[in-house]
């Protein structure tokens, strides 16, 4: 039947409702409180359903409705468009309809990192830059979706960060500017994200730390300058004695539209 339509939308995901109880257990609930999972994929035969529909009609959009991350590499590799609606509430259907019919340009970003499989967990963010990285034998090293990732119906470019000074004593504030441009053909909004990396520190810090962000609405071809104001607190951390430390040194400042390395541009200050 799906072959007879110009485009097909299939809604899959998890169920967090408790409405079927047998012996004190909810067998239909697949997410939520007291429902730990040993895998990140779609429960049941939902992936088989998506594949069966895809065989009949390649113009397919998958909509995830879930309160947890869903990791299905096959869907990411084969389906043209994916919408993660999370748990949108009673008005979620109307909001989703506005998105799929182009009345709203989606601009959401992933609030978490989604691993490709449970074999990638736990993902380590605090590792030394000199540490040798071991690769998986049968799995990619990068996550399925990085933190801050999200597409829209238009495209954007974000310039490299431009600090107000490249040598800073930590007093006052450091202004960091970047320019974001709508390079597509539709009005939309982009979230400019600013990360830092401490090149040398007493304690091993995360490779990337989100310190500021701003969501900017742009018409096609329009550009806007975004300026972030950072204080010394943005570069400080807790040492091994749990004391908040403003340690001097070299820092890399990144700007981009997600935490993925390929989307980030940088500048170094000290």
Task: Explain the meaning of each model-derived region.
Residues 1-270:
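C-terminal non-catalytic regions of proteins with extracellular/luminal or membrane-system context
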